[in-house]
Amino acid sequence: MNILIFGPNGSGKGTQGDLIKQKYNLAHIESGAIFREHIGGGTELGKKAKAYIDRGDLVPDEITIPMVLETLKTKGQHGWLLDGFPRNMVQAEKLWEALQKEGMRLDYVVEILLPRETAKNRIMGRRLCKNNNNHPNNIFIEAIKPNGDVCRVCGGTLSSRSDDQDETAINKRHDIYYNTTDGTLAAAYFFKKLADQGKTKYIELNGEGSIESIKETLLSKLA
């Protein structure tokens, strides 16, 4: 099973992705980790990407797409969940074209819907566990409120990202995601149109529910 997941920062996308990964034994592939592994591993694509990053430039899709595909092929042989890519319409079109060329299917596209203001509040209350960033801890959500500075799941030490407390940084991230013209939501809607054509399946989830209720709804639709 191959899945692409969309959702704004604060939607619980990482948490749901982690649950799906465990349920179906999928490779949970996050875009940031792809760059870190290729650059850290000194691959040819990683070296090219690093040259752009060191100059303060965006890595072009001609490098990013092959890196994503290579990771999907090597780590996702038994199924994958791709998280954090594509981020815009152009990348969505290029990714779909590349998947078709490689003969790789895309079984499901999942979108977690959440109002922008709710997403921002969740981000500012988010606390990260040193053992697993996807363990749900949020000081503003009673159901997953941590016990002080201790993870409610494993007891690990909690911390917060500096940019999670920066409203300007959050707004910039959300400006990209909620842009329906050429941003991340435009990319999601590209796949929604493909689903209308029977080329994949598109699942929309209400992100305002509890973690458990969202998980149950998602698993019932994936079954």
From Swiss-Prot:
Primary enzyme class: transferase
Principal location listed in the UniProt entry: cytoplasm
EC number: 2.7.4.3
Residue sites binding AMP per the record: S31, R36, D57, L58, V59, G84, F85, P86, R87, Q91, R161, R173
Signal peptide region: none
Segments of this protein annotated with the region NMP: 30-59
InterPro entries referenced in this protein's UniProt entry, alphabetically: Adenyl_kin_sub (IPR006259), Adenylat/UMP-CMP_kin (IPR000850), Adenylat_kinase_CS (IPR033690), P-loop_NTPase (IPR027417)
PROSITE patterns per the UniProt record, alphabetical: ADENYLATE_KINASE (PS00113)
Segments for region (LID): 125-164
A single GO cellular-component term on record: cytoplasm
Pfam families the record matches: ADK
GO molecular function: adenylate kinase activity; ATP binding
BP GO annotations: AMP salvage
Keyword annotations: ATP-binding, Cytoplasm, Kinase, Nucleotide biosynthesis, Nucleotide-binding, Transferase
UniProt binding sites for ATP: G10, S11, G12, K13, G14, T15, R126, G209
Catalytic activity of the protein: AMP + ATP = 2 ADP
NCBIfam families: adk, PRK14529.1
Purpose of the protein: Catalyzes the reversible transfer of the terminal phosphate group between ATP and AMP. Plays an important role in cellular energy homeostasis and in adenine nucleotide metabolism.
PANTHER family for this protein: NUCLEOTIDE KINASE
Quaternary context: Monomer.
Family: Belongs to the adenylate kinase family.
Protein name as catalogued: Adenylate kinase
Organism field: Desulfovibrio desulfuricans (strain ATCC 27774 / DSM 6949 / MB)
